[in-house]
Amino acid sequence: MDDRREGIIHSEMPANEAGEPIRGIQLWVNLPAVDKMTAPRYQEVSAENIPEVALDGGGKARIIAGTFKNVEGPASGIAVDPLYLDIHLTPGSKTVIDLPVDHAGFVYGLEGTFTVGAGSHGAESHGEGAQLVETRMLAVLSSGTKVTLLAGEKGARLLLIAASPLNEPVARHG
């Protein structure tokens, strides 16, 4: 990655000696208007530097950014104070994730299926019922401080990303 005053030029090329497909996830963060013209910044986080914690009900959460269960992720100094979790749920497990009160966010299915809702931070809090999320699907979380996740019969892997909303327009190219 090459940081330049005008922006960032991508030059990453993940190594994969086994020739198997690999997955990389990038999170681009919208900055508050006051920070829009600051120098671009890039943080690379390698897998071995990501802490993980056990989840009540089965599974684990890897903390990429933010603080979860008193464990801080390695990506830091981000303006919107994101919580960025890589969650692995065991088959049929149910867990509740506590979010900071002022955060809004989404979940994204990486593997398997899971349901978000069950009367907390998900769709059911609006009386619409829980929402099934499959691989490569995204579900926007409703307001609240808890997210209830229920894994499908084969388990699930998902990203949960939440941050302080800016309540500002998004400015493209700047």
Predicted segment positions?
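Jelly-roll (double-stranded beta-helix
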Residues: M1-G174
